[in-house]
Regions:
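N-terminal amphipathic/basic-hydrophobic helices that include classical n-h-c signal peptides
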Residues: 1-21
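Extended, well-ordered protein cores
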Residues: 16-271
Length: 271
């Protein structure tokens, strides 16, 4: 029997995780790109030979979810240090230059997106504007002392981490809960960040099985691990295409995260 006190605690927990109280229609991909059908050890980095920004079959549905999250969960999905604003604005300008090749229309009064939405370009809110234009999330990392630090982000589709806990922290702190991210991998990733060159983006991807297809899955490092973590028996396959590139003026590193979720039946054989 549940005590009254336990009931109140449960209600409080739900209040702090409102996204769990409103089930959404699953936003699923039906296809997995050919170059994401293999497995590689961390960090599994390779040169990006195609476009680093993409528009795919789930664009419309994912963008509707992003718009809703930017309205309802802005404090959880947006972060920008004032000192990082020039880098964020530089990233926005770069993204705008890439959009016409992806089917966007650039007009004096804003952007016409592939799903028909008209988005005003607000340079005073660069991360929010990026979140309204693109499927992928963007994380800004800038070098401070010996490490890159998270100085800005739009993170609508977190996979079991919370932006507010990682904001302003260095790479090693950001990856502390990840079991595979040991000291050797941390050193390799920091060397990788130091070596990223302008105009030569790199990419990798991860592979996780989830019980829940919801794209917005923030989880505190202090909360229990999600159900099914480290198991390959879940009904949904979640993978992130993670692209790294360096901005020319600010020298910031951009971490672009394009999320795909597939039902198990639609996942092709992985080699």
């Amino acid at each position: 029997m549940q005590t009254r006190g336990h009931g109140r605690l449960a209600d409080l927990a739900k209040a702090f995780r409102p996204w769990q109280n409103h089930p959404m229609t699953a936003i699923l991909h039906r296809h997995l790109p050919d170059d994401m059908r293999i497995t590689r050890a961390l960090p599994g980095i390779r040169p990006e030979t195609g476009p680093w920004l993409r528009v795919d079959e789930a664009y419309g549905a994912q963008m509707a979810r992003r718009e809703a999250l930017l309205q309802a969960e802005a404090d959880d999905v947006l972060y920008l240090e004032e000192a990082a604003r020039p880098a964020a604005q530089e990233l926005l300008a770069l993204v705008l230059s890439e959009l016409p090749a992806l089917g966007y229309g650039i007009k004096d009064d804003g952007v016409c997106c592939p799903d028909g939405r008209q988005v005003d370009v607000d340079v005073t809110a660069p991360m929010r504007t990026l979140g309204r234009l693109c499927q992928c999330d963007f994380v800004l990392m800038q070098k401070r002392a010996a490490q890159h630090v998270l100085t800005g982000a739009v993170l609508c589709f977190p996979a079991s981490w919370r932006l507010r806990e990682k904001a302003g922290r260095p790479l090693t702190d950001i990856h502390v809960p990840v079991a595979e991210y040991d000291r050797d991998v941390a050193r390799r990733v920091q060397r990788l960040f130091d070596g990223i060159q302008v105009g030569r983006p790199l990419w990798r991807f991860n592979q996780l099985w989830y019980q829940d297809p919801e794209l917005y899955q923030p989880r505190s490092a202090h909360e229990p691990r999600r159900v099914g973590a480290r198991s390959d028996t879940g009904p949904y396959y979640r993978t992130e295409r993670q692209t790294l590139l360096r901005l020319q003026q600010s020298r910031a590193v951009v971490f672009a995260i394009h999320t795909l979720v597939l039902a198990r039946a639609d996942v092709p054989p992985l080699t």
